[in-house]
């Protein structure tokens, strides 16, 4: 995707988030293809789990040697614990990105 398209998609996500009550628990997660680290949803009250727990986004691509932080887990009104990048087998061989994992407490 071009940067312009990514920004349009982020605006659409933010628009949907604005329709959800601000005090409702919310998780937004997935492949943002955000290698420039511009997918900031903090305006919507969301916190990025790995930035919060590890000080930086998780590296998830390519799966065999993760260098780029393309995937994100954002939360709102939730506590997070044990955020991990699953780099071992079988996880590292299931897709071109390694999966992210986090325990969430209501």
Give names to the regions the model predicted.
Residues 1-106:
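Active-site regions of metal-assisted phosphoester/phosphodiester hydrolases
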């Amino acid at each position: 995707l071009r940067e312009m398209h990514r920004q349009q998609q982020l605006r659409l996500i933010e628009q949907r988030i604005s329709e959800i009550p601000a005090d409702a628990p919310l998780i937004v997660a997935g492949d943002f293809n955000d290698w420039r680290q511009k997918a900031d949803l903090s305006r919507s009250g969301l916190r990025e789990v790995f930035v919060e727990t590890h000080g930086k986004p998780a590296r998830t691509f390519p799966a065999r040697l993760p260098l780029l932080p393309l995937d994100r887990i954002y939360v709102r009104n939730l506590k997070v614990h044990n955020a991990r990048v699953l780099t071992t087998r079988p996880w590292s061989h299931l897709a071109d990105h390694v999966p992210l994992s986090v325990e969430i407490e209501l």
